[in-house]
Amino acid sequence: VIRSFADKATEKVFCGDILTRKEANRLGGLRLEKAQERLAILNRASEKDLLTLRALHYHKLHGSDRYSIDADGRNSKWRITFAWADEGLTDVEFVEIQDTHK
């Protein structure tokens, strides 16, 4: 169960609320409907569930206590990152992955 969000924009997408222009610009390129579906999956899934849902590409972030799944598809530059706590998921947020190979 999602217990907290790292920012208001991610929380608004989860709740289906309207984003401000600034929030929408920051999340440009993110397919919001698909991202909302992924947040709903996170909200009801256990870690075991995430491990078996291969399409999410669930993994631990190297050198961190945070985890990640694809936000809206494998070829997207967007991920949903979060931390596990005893009571559920915390600090859930959308993160745009930058290409460092340019």
For each feature predicted by the language model, list its residue ranges:
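Arg/Lys-rich, positively charged N-terminal/basic patches that mediate binding to nucleic acids
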Residues: 1-38
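Generic structural signal for well-ordered secondary structure
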Residues: 3, 32-35, 51-54, 62, ...
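Residue-level marker of positions within ordered structural domains that often coincide
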Residues: 15, 47, 87
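Short, amphipathic alpha-helical segments that act as regulatory/interfacial helices
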Residues: 36-46
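A short, surface-exposed loop/turn module that caps and links secondary-structure elements
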Residues: 44-70
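Enriched for short, Lys/Arg-rich terminal
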Residues: 62, 66-102
